[in-house]
UniProtKB/Swiss-Prot annotation:
Gene3D superfamilies, per the entry: Winged helix-like DNA-binding domain superfamily/Winged helix DNA-binding domain
Summary of the function given for this chain in its UniProt record: Involved in the cellular defense against the biological effects of O6-methylguanine (O6-MeG) and O4-methylthymine (O4-MeT) in DNA. Repairs the methylated nucleobase in DNA by stoichiometrically transferring the methyl group to a cysteine residue in the enzyme. This is a suicide reaction: the enzyme is irreversibly inactivated.
Active site: 142
Gene Ontology terms, MF aspect: methylated-DNA-[protein]-cysteine S-methyltransferase activity
Name the record gives this protein: Methylated-DNA--protein-cysteine methyltransferase
Length: 176
């Protein structure tokens, strides 16, 4: 499997009263931003079309490991992400249950929005809404959740990227 060179870039973000930092991982498939604060990683951002600013400092070790894991995942490797570095403080209780269900979907498998909703105790529409606000795409693999008719459904990185990720994991969509 070919490995790509990745560059880490620090971006400072002012969010309300909280100062956060973001490192970006540049990858041929998509650029990723990992945002963290005092309590851990607060968001993973798919950076398609986002203007980037550079600062050549090195990320903390936990962030570097997460970025390396994301790079390996995008290179097609099977990765067991360390979820302990993620800060779920911005998630509702229901969204956290949905994300817990989705984090257990193995590579090469999918669940429907209805199946996720049943396991999380909600409706398919509320599960889809919770996933549309997934703060940790790729690490919490919401791309593995599809519609009941076998179509991809939506994805914050775009349906084209969702299909590429699923194909990379060996999933072919029936409704396509």
């Amino acid at each position: 499997m070919k490995q790509f060179e990745c560059m880490y870039t620090l971006i400072n973000i002012h969010e309300a009263e909280t100062f956060k930092c973001m490192y970006t991982l540049m990858h041929p498939l998509i650029d990723i931003g990992v945002v963290w604060g005092d309590d851990g990683v607060t968001a993973i951002i798919l950076l398609e079309g986002v203007k980037k600013y550079s600062n050549d400092s090195s990320p903390p070790m936990a962030i570097k490991k997460l970025l390396d894991s994301i790079r390996m995942f995008l290179d097609g490797c099977e990765v067991d992400f360390d979820l302990s570095v993620l800060d779920f403080g911005g998630c509702t209780e229901y969204q956290r249950r949905v994300l817990d269900v989705v984090s257990s979907i193995p590579r090469g498998s999918t669940l429907t929005y209805s199946e996720v909703a049943a396991r999380a105790g909600g409706s398919p529409r509320s599960a889809a809404g919770a996933l549309s606000r997934n703060p940790f795409p790729l690490v919490i693999p919401c791309h593995r959740v599809i519609r009941s008719d076998g179509n991809a459904g939506g994805y914050q990185g775009g349906v084209k990227l969702k299909k590429r990720l699923l194909e990379m994991e060996g999933v072919s969509l029936e409704g396509q």
